[in-house]
From Swiss-Prot:
Keywords: Lyase. This is Methylglyoxal synthase. One of its GO terms (cellular component) is cytosol. The active site is at D60. The keyword Oxidoreductase does not apply. Its EC number is 4.2.3.3. It is an enzyme of class 4 (lyase). Pfam families: MGS. SMART domains: MGS. Belongs to the methylglyoxal synthase family.
Amino acid sequence: MKIALIAHDKKKDDMVSFAYAYKPIFEQHELFATGTTGLRVMEATGLAVTRYQSGPLGGDQEIGAMIAKNALDMVIFFRDPLTAQPHEPDVNALLRLCDVYAIPLATNMASAEMLMHALNRGDLDYRKFRK
């Protein structure tokens, strides 16, 4: 499966910890990420990650384009709900695309853990047939 990892600045440490904790599962899948998030995950875990621009420079839109092309199966986006983001319209557009195309989306660690367990059990294998 193809999984996107995105984290706002104050959530990047959480994403790195999450990726490290679930490294055995992530190793079985293809990972994509916005710039700094992808770099930090790669450096901390050794996982292969295809990196796009940082979110404010268009990375959220690049990942959104993948969703619109049915080229992503899951998005894990650790958002910082307490800090205003300069690219909030891009963030909202990405979340909307996940809804439009029925892409599983987690926006915090608790929901991301649920998705990872579902992924590991094969509960998301239906995505293979939506291509």
